[in-house]
Amino acid sequence: MNYTSYILAFQLCVILGSSGCYCQAPFFDEIENLKKYFNASHPDVADGGPLFLEILKNWKEESDKKIIQSQIVSFYFKLFENLKDNRIIQRSMDIIKQDMFQKFLNGSSEKLEDFKKLIQIPVDNLKVQRKAISELIKVMNDLSPKSNLRKRKRRQNQIQGRRASK
């Protein structure tokens, strides 16, 4: 290979790498495999409208959208868990789960483990229900907006700093 061929090969690698097409093609192929396996083009799939797409359209803010996405990702993880013994589609599910893991949980294995723990908590278990109710106050406090308090303190410090400099 001469110098020009190396440069052309390098440029091709850069173009394919930056476009994202090269990386996403296997992902889309795996979704197509699952669509074929589940016969997702069957007319009854359209009955009742989409499962998730309309809901996703209703949520515009990034933080709100993350909440909905977590529930949707949870659904897919449960679906894949129920089908884990199916050898025909195992590879496709593994590739898609890995991609979801990278996109939704930023590749953090700790977040993935916590997410899996939450998914697997049985809601029909009395002991679990008791624990959940026992922790409810702390969970509600954790959900309350702390950022407003921080913003207020920051503003107060800025105002006090301006007064002191005058």
UniProtKB/Swiss-Prot annotation:
The keyword Secreted applies. The modification Pyrrolidone carboxylic acid is found at Q24. Released primarily from activated T lymphocytes. GO terms for molecular function: cytokine activity; type II interferon receptor binding. One of its GO terms (cellular component) is extracellular space. The keyword DNA-binding does not apply. Glycans are attached at N39, N106. GO terms for biological process: adaptive immune response; defense response to virus; humoral immune response; positive regulation of autophagy. It is found in: Secreted. Residues 147-166 are annotated as: Disordered. Residues 1-23 form the signal peptide. Its main location: secreted. Keywords: Antiviral defense, Cytokine, Glycoprotein, Growth regulation, Pyrrolidone carboxylic acid, Secreted, Signal. InterPro entries: 4_helix_cytokine-like_core, Interferon_gamma. Belongs to the type II (or gamma) interferon family. Type II interferon produced by immune cells such as T-cells and NK cells that plays crucial roles in antimicrobial, antiviral, and antitumor responses by activating effector immune cells and enhancing antigen presentation. Primarily signals through the JAK-STAT pathway after interaction with its receptor IFNGR1 to affect gene regulation. Upon IFNG binding, IFNGR1 intracellular domain opens out to allow association of downstream signaling components JAK2, JAK1 and STAT1, leading to STAT1 activation, nuclear translocation and transcription of IFNG-regulated genes. Homodimer. Interacts with IFNGR1 (via extracellular domain); this interaction promotes IFNGR1 dimerization. This is Interferon gamma. The gene is IFNG.
